[in-house]
């Protein structure tokens, strides 16, 4: 079981400021997490392939297709801000970047 001093030490190392309520709650929560990790370490994983994902990921989006849009002026007319034939967007990089 993790004690209060260990919680305070870990919080200090992680640069966390804990409230007294959090300090009282964390020993049991951290102990439960460590108990679970210990259970996991007892599992036989010799025949389990290493993976970075629990489930297979597949791309379910459609293939990109280039299409021409007939009325570019209609798009520009509905833009909140524009300059000539271009959309104006807020600057996202500062002067030094």
From Swiss-Prot:
Pfam families: GatC. One of its GO terms (biological process) is translation. Its EC number is 6.3.5.-. It comes from the Bacteria. It catalyses: L-glutamyl-tRNA(Gln) + L-glutamine + ATP + H2O = L-glutaminyl-tRNA(Gln) + L-glutamate + ADP + phosphate + H(+); L-aspartyl-tRNA(Asn) + L-glutamine + ATP + H2O = L-asparaginyl-tRNA(Asn) + L-glutamate + ADP + phosphate + 2 H(+). The keyword Lipid metabolism does not apply. InterPro entries: Asp/Glu-ADT_sf_sub_c (IPR036113), GatC (IPR003837). One of its GO terms (molecular function) is glutaminyl-tRNA synthase (glutamine-hydrolyzing) activity. Coiled coil: none annotated. Keywords: ATP-binding, Ligase, Nucleotide-binding, Protein biosynthesis. Heterotrimer of A, B and C subunits. Allows the formation of correctly charged Asn-tRNA(Asn) or Gln-tRNA(Gln) through the transamidation of misacylated Asp-tRNA(Asn) or Glu-tRNA(Gln) in organisms which lack either or both of asparaginyl-tRNA or glutaminyl-tRNA synthetases. The reaction takes place in the presence of glutamine and ATP through an activated phospho-Asp-tRNA(Asn) or phospho-Glu-tRNA(Gln). Belongs to the GatC family. This is Aspartyl/glutamyl-tRNA(Asn/Gln) amidotransferase subunit C. It comes from Picosynechococcus sp. (strain ATCC 27264 / PCC 7002 / PR-6).
């Amino acid at each position: 079981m993790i004690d209060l001093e260990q919680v305070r030490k870990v919080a200090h190392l992680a640069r966390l400021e804990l409230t007294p309520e959090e300090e009282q709650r964390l020993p049991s929560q951290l102990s439960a997490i460590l108990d679970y990790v210990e259970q996991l370490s007892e599992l036989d994983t010799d025949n389990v392939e290493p993976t970075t994902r629990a489930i297979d990921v597949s791309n379910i989006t459609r293939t990109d297709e280039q299409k021409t849009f007939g009325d570019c002026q209609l798009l520009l007319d509905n833009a909140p801000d524009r300059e000539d034939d271009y959309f104006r967007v807020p600057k996202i990089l500062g002067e030094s970047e």
